[in-house]
């Protein structure tokens, strides 16, 4: 009986991990503006990746919209965000976990310029 319970518990843990890996990682835009460029780089670097907004059918991410993120593993990242007004800001040290949703709020934005 004890072995059966351990086996069931192990299967549940494995299934939960597999389902998280099957879900897309997504960015939730909680800034005040529509985002037209969203790039990620490993925290503390300027090795910016592709514009993730290309993953959206209209190429932008409205307030309270979620964007599918591709080509990014779990870890800490900096984000470069350009909104429709032309403002470019950064969000630093974002914790991203594969298969989960992460958000950036207006208060997270620093070093903004036009």
Where do the PLM segments sit?
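Asparagine-centered strand-capping/turn motif at beta-strand->loop junctions
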Residues: 26-34, 42
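Intrinsically disordered, low-complexity Pro/Gly/Ser/Thr-rich segments with frequent PxxP/GP/PP motifs
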Residues: 48-73
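Sec/Tat signal peptide C-region and signal peptidase I cleavage site
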Residues: 16-20
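Structural beta-strand segments of beta-rich domains
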Residues: 21-25, 65
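Sec-dependent N-terminal signal peptides
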Residues: 4-14
């Amino acid at each position: 009986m004890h072995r059966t319970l351990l086996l069931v518990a192990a299967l549940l843990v494995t299934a939960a991990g597999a389902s998280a890996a099957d879900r897309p990682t997504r960015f939730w835009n909680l800034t005040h503006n529509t985002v037209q460029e969203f790039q990620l780089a490993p925290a503390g670097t300027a090795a910016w990746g592709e514009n993730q907004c290309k993953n959206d059918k209209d190429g932008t991410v409205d307030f309270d919209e979620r964007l599918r993120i591709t080509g990014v593993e779990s870890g800490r990242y900096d984000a470069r965000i350009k909104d429709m007004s032309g403002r470019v800001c950064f969000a630093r040290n974002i914790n991203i976990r594969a298969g989960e949703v992460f958000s950036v709020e207006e208060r997270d934005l620093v070093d903004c310029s036009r």
